[in-house]
Amino acid sequence: MTTSWSDRLQNAADLPANMDGHALKKYRREAYHRVFVNRSLAMEKIKCFGFDMDYTLAVYKSPEYESLGFDLTVERLVSIGYPQELLNFVYDPTFPTRGLVFDSTYGNLLKVDAYGNILVCAHGFNFMRGPEIREQYPNKFIQRDDTDRFYILNTLFNLPETYLLACLVDFFTNCDRYTSCEMGFKDGDLFMSFRSMFQDVRDAVDWVHYKGSLKEKTVENLPKYVVKDPKLPLLLSRMNEVGKVFLVTNSDYKYTHKIMTYLFDLPHGPKPGSSHRLWQTYFDLILVDARKPLFFGEGTVLRQVDTNTGKLKIGTYTGPLQHGIVYSGGSSDIVCDLLGAKGKDILYIGDHIFGDILKSKKRQGWRTFLVIPELAQELHVWTDKSSLFEELQSLDIFLAELYKHLDSSSNERPDISSIQRRIKKVTHDMDMCYGMMGSLFRSGSRQTLFASQVMRYADLYAASFINLLYYPFSYLFRAAHVLMPHESTVEHTHVDIHETESPMATRNRCSLDFKDSDFKRHQLTRSISEIKPPNLFPQKPQEITHCHDEDDDEEEEEEEEEEEEEEE
């Protein structure tokens, strides 16, 4: 009779160290069902689940939605005086990726790492090589904090804008009617800087979103532009069983109502056979016109929406939370008060790394779940093109072999040029599998700015929040060890540093016998006082204190409960 792991693990003596010497393989869900972890999070501690709407609950179809936004923005630019030829451009989803930086001085799109080092540089449709890049960026580096010059195109809404900027720069650089300059272009005596062009594009994008017909055309053909997932009601109803669920969106009520009605327009309720429910019934709190990221700071006045007309009722709402009421404005502090929750009780789920994730974490301490729809393709390439990744590893091995028996006394210079060329070729082929700008998360071995932001601010991330459906609400999302190079490339074998290293590299932190006279202060320099400190040396912790990665505050909770009991 075999014993299940769950039964064996009930006994501390049967923990992995004593599991009959068999190698254990960690169980993992299918890649397309996975939720990935940057910081450990215990789901049973989450009391409230918060959602953004656009690109989170409502996922817009790609490239249909981006094409619509692109076309409308081009039409707006032409209407204010830009050349008619621009109407011939068609959105190409293989070119842009999120997280690119636009240099408004030189008109370049830059893919950079977390420190501002340039990984890819494109001027229009022309991908610049190393020498060209160094002419404008001598160290292949930018000052990211120069926000007046560099604009980060971080959101999914930025994708059409990213491609449009490339189209415009390429057009004005190569069209015979215009004279190309380093910082813009000339039409006779008229000069247009890339900075002015960029501002025109920004203004046109804002006009399309807030005054134009983007939302109108979207709701006219929702099946074409919005993904409907029949599992959505089931997940929200299960969340309702273990906590509160709320919606915070920047969209107005009329648009929100049409989108949400479509998402929940199913022949059944949470489960097949159950009766249909209105979308409002799945949420304890609904808040529109949030104006994130301002919402996570001082916020705006909280008002009540008249759901019959979509207009706001007069006055500030000061009452308690009421089920079925739709609110406008407000702030994250107000949400916490209405829900009776504090920062870490809340898991907020959104797609906007700045407006949703960074601000909710830094200002409120909310736990964060970042939705990254591109992750599905990233995982596909990662698994489908594994041969390219394996070849890169093999090339690293060949490179190491060439230097294997050489040290500082060697005059031999191995010819590594062919290996370097092959590494560049394989890295390029690998990048092109993702699109013209390469992976969202890396360029070769270098992680992108976007990847560093995901790791820094998102506790959890996945291609879709629907993946939470495949985990119990008691689940502990435990972060994997993030290894530094000296940890990931060194085997777990004992090395005696006293015998193998120079005296300059032997600093250690092992215990010493401080009672030995050799470690007492020298009597000639200072006499030892007869009055000794209460604790002469620190004591090694006898209880578990170094457990910051487990999202485990049991002792704090017990202390709080004891204090509450004493007060009663």
Curated annotation (Swiss-Prot):
Q: Where is this region: Disordered?
A: 528-568
Activity modulation comment = Allosterically activated by various compounds including ATP, 2,3-BPG/2,3-Bisphosphoglyceric acid and Ap4A/P1,P4-bis(5'-adenosyl) tetraphosphate. Binding of an allosteric activator is a prerequisiste to magnesium and substrate binding. Inhibited by inorganic phosphate.
Known EC number: 3.1.3.5, 3.1.3.99, 2.7.1.77
Q: Which residues does Mg(2+) bind?
A: 52, 54, 351
Q: Name one Pfam family in it.
A: 5_nucleotid
Q: Name one GO biological process term.
A: GMP metabolic process
Q: Which cofactor does it need?
A: Mg(2+)
Q: Which domain of life is it from?
A: Eukaryota
**For this protein, what does the record note about how its cofactor is bound?**
Binds 1 Mg(2+) ion per subunit.
Output the CDD domains linked to this UniProt entry.
HAD_cN-II
Keyword annotations? Allosteric enzyme, ATP-binding, Cytoplasm, Hydrolase, Magnesium, Metal-binding, Nucleotide metabolism, Nucleotide-binding, Transferase
A cellular-component GO term for this protein:
cytosol
The active site annotation covers 52 (nucleophile), 54 (proton donor)
- What is its subcellular localisation? Cytoplasm, Cytosol
Q: Where is this region: Required for tetramer assembly?
A: 548-568
User: Which intervals of the chain form a coiled coil?
Assistant: none
User: Which residues participate in ATP binding?
Assistant: 144, 154, 453, 456
Q: Which residue intervals are annotated with compositional bias (Acidic residues) in the record?
A: 550-568
InterPro entries attached to this UniProt entry: HAD-like_sf, HAD-SF_hydro_IG_5-nucl, HAD_sf, Pur_nucleotidase
Keyword Cytoplasm among record annotations: yes
The GO terms describing molecular function are: 5'-nucleotidase activity; ATP binding; GMP 5'-nucleotidase activity; identical protein binding; IMP 5'-nucleotidase activity; metal ion binding; nucleoside phosphotransferase activity; XMP 5'-nucleosidase activity
Work out whether the entry's keyword set contains Metal-binding.
Answer: yes
Role played: Broad specificity cytosolic 5'-nucleotidase that catalyzes the dephosphorylation of 6-hydroxypurine nucleoside 5'-monophosphates. In addition, possesses a phosphotransferase activity by which it can transfer a phosphate from a donor nucleoside monophosphate to an acceptor nucleoside, preferably inosine, deoxyinosine and guanosine. Has the highest activities for IMP and GMP followed by dIMP, dGMP and XMP. Could also catalyze the transfer of phosphates from pyrimidine monophosphates but with lower efficiency.
Family assignment?
Belongs to the 5'(3')-deoxyribonucleotidase family.
Its recorded name reads Cytosolic purine 5'-nucleotidase
Q: Which organism is it from?
A: Xenopus tropicalis
